[in-house]
Design a protein with these regions (language model features):
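Eukaryote-specific, cytoplasm-facing alpha-helical/coiled-coil scaffolding segments in long proteins
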Residues: 92-102, 140
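Short, surface-exposed beta-strand/strand-loop-strand elements in extracellular ectodomains
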Residues: 84-89
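Polybasic, proline/glycine-rich intrinsically disordered low-complexity segments
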Residues: 99-125
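Intrinsic-disorder/low-complexity loop/linker signature
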Residues: 52, 90-92
Length: 150
C-alpha cells in the first residue's frame, strides 16, 4: 500500500507549498480524495484511502495521474480563494493581486489538459460510443425476387 503522506508530500512539492502556506492539510487531503475518485472513474481502477494508506498500491503511472489530478483540484481551490483579491495603491506604490485567480485558472486548465492526454494514452477514447467496423457494405435483398449472378 502507498502511504497517503508520500502522495501528499509529492503534491505539496508540485504546488511549491512544502511548508503548507497556500493550503491546509485538510484542503490537500480533500484534493487527493477527489483525485482518487476521478482517476478511478477515468481509468477504471479501484483505489481508496484506507486509514493512512492508499490501497491497492499505486503504480508509478497511476501515482503520477493521481498527483496531477489532485494538483488541478488544488489550483481550483486556490483560484476560488484568489477571486476575492483586489488591487490597491498608495502614492507611487501599487499592489495588484487581481490576476492571481486568472493565473491559478490557467494553471488548472493546463494541468487538466495534461491529465486528459495521459488518460487517453491509457484508455483510448471511443468515438461517440460507436464501434468503427471499417468498410462494411450492407446487403439488400428483396423478398420474392431472384437475383442473377453477374
Amino acid at each position: 500500500m502507498t502511504p497517503v503522506s508520500d502522495i501528499l508530500a509529492l503534491l505539496r512539492t508540485d504546488l511549491g507549498d512544502a511548508a503548507g502556506e497556500l493550503l491546509g492539510d485538510n484542503d490537500v487531503l480533500r484534493a487527493l480524495t477527489r483525485s482518487i475518485l476521478a482517476v478511478n472513474r477515468d481509468i477504471g481502477r479501484l483505489y481508496q484511502i484506507a486509514g493512512d494508506d492508499i490501497a491497492p498500491d499505486l503504480s508509478g503511472d497511476d501515482a503520477d495521474l493521481v498527483v496531477l489530478r489532485a494538483h488541478a483540484f488544488c489550483c481550483s481551490m486556490l483560484r476560488s480563494a484568489a477571486s476575492a483579491n483586489f488591487s490597491f495603491g498608495s502614492g507611487d506604490k501599487r499592489v495588484d493581486k487581481t490576476m492571481q485567480a486568472q493565473a491559478w485558472g490557467d494553471l488548472e486548465k493546463d494541468l487538466l489538459d495534461r491529465y486528459r492526454d495521459a488518460v487517453e494514452k491509457i484508455v483510448p477514447p471511443v468515438a461517440d460510443c460507436l464501434l468503427d467496423v471499417g468498410n462494411v457494405r450492407p446487403q439488400i435483398f428483396e423478398v420474392g425476387r431472384r437475383h442473377a449472378r453477374h
